[in-house]
Amino acid sequence: MLSIQHGCVEIEFHGGAQVVIEGPAELELITDMQVRCNQGKLYAEVPPRAVGFEILSPDVTVVDRGTEFGMEVTRAGTTEVHVFSGKVDYAVPLAPEGSMKLLEGKAILVHRSGESKTIPIRPASFTTAPPGGNSAAWEKSTALLRSDPTLVVQYTFDAASLASRTLRNHAPMAKPESHGTIVGCTPTEGRWPGKLALDFKLADDRVRFALNRQHERMTCVMWVKPEMTGKPFTALLMSSAAAPGEMQWQFDQNGRLVAGKRILAGWGDSNVEQIDTGKLLTPQRVGTWMQLAFVYDGSAGTFTHYLDGKKVEAGTISTNPPLVTARLEIGNWTPLDGSPPDAERGFVGSIDELLIFSRALHDDEIRNLWNIGREL
């Protein structure tokens, strides 16, 4: 029996399957082609030579057919199965259907009673490699996220994008206007050697793109290395218009992270509802890489801030209007005509990743994204 209280363990089986287990977990390694999981969360990558690799839980038996999949087994008597690529066969002991197939991009929740239902796939919930691994592990995790249909923006700041001056959106079904136009900005080193970023120094440096959507729920995750600007606000991701629902995400002059949306049309501050954190951009953090994230849940009327995978602030906000993303700017921000003359926002520093989801990510998903993406 293998018992893991905290952290992650990666096992490569003689048959070729690779499994990453996240604690707390209890596993029994039966053979090099069969594992029993009584509790825990795991990610499995199974090459062709290991087709038929089995993972058993008290609720379901999963037989791999050459794929990547994740499982979460709880003490409460449920098992989740998420298929990121390929397909698996699964059998529920108390269900009359016998063996069934679960295809790529699908996920199920199985109860110990034998009942099961389809659930949204959540690749960000699963750790694909132990934290602090290497760039290959980050690239694997980045590719895995593309199986999530709610991923609407994925900027990796890859070499081809920076060379072409167009920041490619790697999200599935990305629309042409969602690819970012790089204005100014120069390539620089990112979080680790070999990782690229964009450096923002001049007032015109920014990335422009459009994401013409209304969001009942939304998550933004950014890796950023901010410097002091000397201006009242340091812009991260801002909408260009002053229509109801338009979003804003920035630091204020006191180093507090601010996220919110415009409730009424117009540029006045009274038209905006926002949630502020305590001081996060301290002198010690200036010039260092950090993961920033916010989660907006319109049905609950909440904004939640995260720093380096940890929740730092949450607050309530009006449920209407929905959060709107139209024309957006990363970094320095200049609003459309009709705004007050002091409305511009500066940004000095580097950015090397941006993710936007059209759902509210869970705490563990934000933490996993930080774990796999932190500096090597």
Which positions does each model-derived feature cover?
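Extracellular glycan-recognition modules
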Residues: 148-154, 159-179, 188, 199-267, ...
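Short, aromatic/His-centered strand-loop micro-motif at the edge of beta-sheets
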Residues: 265-291
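Carbohydrate-binding surfaces in secreted/extracellular proteins
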Residues: 294-316
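Flexible, surface-exposed loop/linker segments and immediately adjacent secondary-structure boundaries
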Residues: 1, 5-108
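Glycine-centered tight beta-turn/hairpin loop motif at sheet-sheet or coil-to-beta transitions
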Residues: 14-16, 59, 95, 202-204, ...
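Extended recognition patches within non-cytosolic domains
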Residues: 104, 113-115, 119-149, 302, ...
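Extracellular/lumenal ectodomain signal focusing on beta-strand-rich modules
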Residues: 39, 85, 154, 184, ...
